[in-house]
Amino acid sequence: MAVAHLACDSQGSVVDLSGQGLQKLSPTLPFGNDTQTLILDKNQIIKLEHVEKCRNLVQLSVANNRLVRMMGVAKLIHLRVLNLPHNSIGYVEGLKDLVHLEWINLAGNNLKIIDQINSSTSLQHLDLSDNNISQIGDLSKLKSLKTLLLHGNNIASLRAASACLPQSLTILSLAENEIRDLNEVAFLAGLVDLEQLSIMNNPCVMATPSIPGFDYRPFIVSWCLNLKVLDGYVVSQKESLKAEWLYSQGKGRSYRLGQHIPLVQYLATVCPLTSAHGLQTEEDAKLDKILSKQRLHQKQLLHQTRSDGYLTSSTPNKRLPLSTEHHSPTHVLQTEPTVQVNNWLRSSSSEDHSYAVRNICSSPFGPPHYSSLYMEDIQTDEDKLNCSLLSSESTFMPVAPGLSPVSPTVELRVPAIKADLPVNETVIEFNKDHTELPPSETPEKPKLIPGLSAMQDDKSCCVYPVIKDENVTENIINCETAVSMESTQTSNGPTCHNLIMNCKQASVLDQDVNHINKISKAATKLQSCWRGFYARKYNPKVKDVCYEIRLSRMQEHIVFLTEEVIRLRKEKEEDRIQRILQGEAVRYLWEQVQAIQQWQNTVKLQTANSSENDLPSASNSKHANPALEELPSSPEKLNRKASPDIPDSGFHSVILNHCTMGNTEKNSSEESEYSQPSLDTGRHYNDKVPDSPADQDLTREEQSQSSKDSFTSEQDSSLLQQYLRSVEQLDETADNTSYSERTEESRPEITTCSDNSDLSCSISHFLPENSKQENIDIHSNLPSIDDGHNTPIPCDSSLLVPQPDLV
């Protein structure tokens, strides 16, 4: 196993065993009592063993391993720095005796609670980010704690912050948690020394489609009054003024816990989110006006102090500042626009990490304290709206100077000049391409006016804005105002001449600035077009994004086509089922039609057989009953009654002749009562007096066949009910007509027939079976009604062959 070499420095020995594939620590490893720094990063260590022999160990780093417990550090009582990120540690232990600990990093573990850290009273930095902590533990005994990083956890409430967090806390990171109510920020009001706070990427500050955009920064500043940096951006003067207004006159502190939606709606009205300069509200315009007046007043005071002799003519290379802001160590007023500061790393080196800084011009005759100025990475409001910095990586974690984020509009910042002079915190930018005027055109400036000499000596280092052209005009107006104020103090001729020349130079400067701004805009547009083309063609990340967009569109199209295919398939299935039902219905109707045709053929055959059987029975009754033929009646009228006009429908019904059994004065109801015995008598006579045995058998077969046919026809009788009703109506009409005619023309014949019928019926009813043959002889001996006609006219229509009841 390879062992890393020992590297000793002035502070003691350093043992670096990172990336060696170690799974455990053996006693033979090269570290002893003199080891002060031990680095075991990027190994496979599960348990810390044999590190207690390093009694003087001050710094220990075991990052990116497989540690489950941290009890192995319990005996390292001199330990000051403990770095254990990205392991599998479940709970904090072994820190009870480590009273000298100042820096602990436990990020990226499986911690759920904060415990056993109160004993490390010297702790200043505690990193518990990217764990599973759901609530803030008790850290009130850590009086020296300055930095607490809790981003990337599951914290949903800050109720315990005022009681569990120490008052000395200056940096607090709560980003990427589960805080859903913006009113939870009120519990941070007790942290009076809090200067930097991060609350980004929480549900309470994230934009939603149902809620209009709002700026939460003034509301948080209204609770944390000493806050200087929020979410990685410096709190601007405008935000401070809005926070003061929310605290004093607005409703910022009137909302309580659980009223997140009303608070957000209120902030959307008083602090709307505007990303462009042309979308400023009326309140923003008023604030800008107030701040501009404040800067103008400060300029006037500066000029007044210079004219009084604060700045003499012996310092001709001093510049006229564009804006000056006084500040105290406890409260610093930042100038507009809002800037982003990485204030963990401040380097005095001359390395330039920003491509927006054109040139740094300094006068060789300037004071020596300008050489001690240093640069910081700053960012304007436009970059703040377009950036996606995570506080856990870019804001609260130190990075190397060469890897610091670069902003396209980074400017030079001068935080301090000298203790005995007002501090200038104006964001300025120098242009090295500015051409100086020829010396011949510059008039000789008198030494009586120090302000003018300072202005004219400043031509070699011109100030240009980055964002707005209005700033240049305002600066020129301020310059003219300052010149006019100083001109009132003198009355000589050269001073007026110098004022005129200064105004001309200001106008020329304005034209040059406009021309340069146009060129800059054109160059920026060309660069943006080229960068877009290059990114789309050669940048792998952009190509991957374009590929993902194409895949997403293709997926959406496939989903749409799938839905269409499913819909068409359902429609086709419904059409198929409908066609099947229609086919079944047509088949059923065809079967019904076939059944009706078969039944019609059966009825026709039955009718034909009945008509053939009627003829022999009628002839037999004529020969057997000659006396009945002699009854006085009109054959034409009887035939007209027996066969009325019935439409030929294929279903012939036999009309029974009812003989009247009473006098002509009786009504139709009495005649119907007498017709029933006559019908029974006729049937009885027909049954008892057959012509021959063969005819009797044929009659019985026909009756049984007709009964079967009638039973079969009952199933389809409903189809003929309407037709038979119409036939019955015609029959009743014909019966009434024929009956009225017969009663008037042949009343004696009907009476005689009725008497004879009653006599024969009564005789046949009371005679025994052996005497019924004699009754037949009696009827045969009766005289014929009409010898001239061969058609037999029976007394009752029941003598015919009975037909089946079709209804």
UniProtKB/Swiss-Prot annotation:
Residues 681-690 have a biased composition (Basic and acidic residues). It is found in: Cytoplasm, Cytoskeleton, Microtubule organizing center, Centrosome. GO terms for cellular component: centrosome; cytoplasm. GO terms for biological process: cell projection organization; negative regulation of cilium assembly. Residues 208-246 form the LRRCT domain. Acts as a key negative regulator of ciliogenesis in collaboration with ccp110 by capping the mother centriole thereby preventing cilia formation. Required for recruitment of ccp110 to the centrosome. This is Centrosomal protein of 97 kDa. It comes from Xenopus laevis. The lineage of its organism: Eukaryota, Metazoa, Chordata, Craniata, Vertebrata.
